[in-house]
């Protein structure tokens, strides 16, 4: 699309085709991050066979993760804990990558067990300016896909926060990035270090939490940048006020391994009130198809601090009524009320425990 727009004299509101290609290919993106001085995980270039993967995994040290070079959305990613698994996992990951992306190229990275997923929102213009709008924590995930996001990231030091923001700006500046983008990192909580994961050259699903605490309309900035205007803000203009949390409400039954639940919505009563934002396409009578992503709504709540934002989110989820399809509302209420989540002790495996401990609320209201 970006190429077609350029060839026909149409200005795409978004980054260039070259940047999309560079960051869309994870191996090239890793190389560009390293060139910009951004830490990267021990890993590999393209892995051509299971035997080669075994050799690299032995050098890096287990566990490792096999990843699709053209991947995204959690597809084409497999954790390997034993060398004996590699042949089978390599075949499965390459087949999944080929089916999802038309490219079965794989690479290896060291796997971090006690990890957090922290990302930084950046904006860049055609005049060489790049700023960040702070970071988000997106560690609460199922199948490598985000479920709850919040900003700013809790339980990190000021030094860590400054360093991860600086790294994101460094990468975007180094490649001359124009538009809104998100630089994603994996944080090793045991070592207190972070590593480049990928860069998404678009507005993220979770961008509202950043908008709510900065007061900056990211989409409006995208249009201004596309029109050739300089950024509306210098870095010194960006201030973080309060705390925002976003819950993704999906048509899925969490207790059944997040099984999709298509159907017709027979009741739709979202919460309302100060500090509540709802981004959704749904309404009573809407039919949720079986063919597309299961996201029904993004519920965003803002408070003066994290504790008050959590309390407000708990209330908002409690008053959200959806019938006709199974949803993740019960799971989200359970997650927000969890002691570890409430204290900010999160990692990318938290959802696995939450599902095991989730109380039985009976069948969903369908």
Protein language model features and the residues they cover:
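N-terminal beta-alpha lobe that positions the nucleotide/phosphoryl donor
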Residues: 1-183, 187-204
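Catalytic cores of soluble metabolic enzymes centered on carboxylation/carboxyl-transfer
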Residues: 168, 208-366
